[in-house]
Amino acid sequence: MDVILHIGAHRTGTTTFQDYMRRHSEPLAEAGIGYWGPGRTRRGLFSGLVPKPEVAKGRDLRRRAEGRIQLQLTAARARGLKTLLISDENMIGTVRDNIRTGSLYPAIGERMSRFARAFEGQLSTVIFSPRSLELYWSSALSYGIARGHAVPERDKLRGIAQSRRGWRDVITDLACALPEADIRVMPFETYAGRPEVLLEQGAGLEAPRNSERMWLNRAPTLADLRRVLADRGSEGSVLPFGMGRWNPFTPEENAALRETYADDMMWLHAGADGMATLTEDQTRTRAGKILPAGPQTEGQGNELDERQVARPG
């Protein structure tokens, strides 16, 4: 049985993809394709695989987690599944950690090496979606405020914009942790709101027709953020005037973030040093120009803390 991981990144349409997979789980199962999403992985399946500081010493929770995963994989094979797709962006880290460190998934290598051991060489493919950095960070910071974070200070924003860590570094760490896996990079700008295309071109599987076009868990707008701040007694005037998407960066910072992303994409187009494959939708002549209707914001309500249980639905 092949195991395929869909690992985000956060803020790239993961909730929409997971909803699509959940709604079509029956026809996929009939075709020998199983699906595990956050509703399963965050209810104890992965607990202990990545250690937390508060865990008592001497308890080998990692080995227990590996055994638990292996039991579930054995059960999936016994049901006749040929492929298992697992989608959970918290495997690579959390938005909370990204905001705290001002960096993109600084622990992705260590985390994914633990998942590699848990799946014992059964991983065939990893699907990863980057997003233009100024939009990624704007979305992440907006959702952070909605989940209790303070509005970031200028020094924090400047540090994020000046960070040298881009998606190239994230993908390099991922490839080092999973040297045997086929890493397929599918940019948000091309595949946003098109989960069936992501499944077909990322996993190489025949995808059920998606009759319900939805864009789930959008990031909060400026108006939403003002209400959030007012509800907790904070001053909403720290945010700029307007009703649409919040962009906290200066024009110079936006330019720096766009330049880093352009360098990342150039590296991917050049072959990514053999570490990953940039998957491009041949039905589109120009990526990133046609997106689903509605605000270009995306999010997952429980992505900031991987200890939370995914909402049903």
Residues covered by each model-derived region:
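Anion-recognition interface
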Residues: 1-313
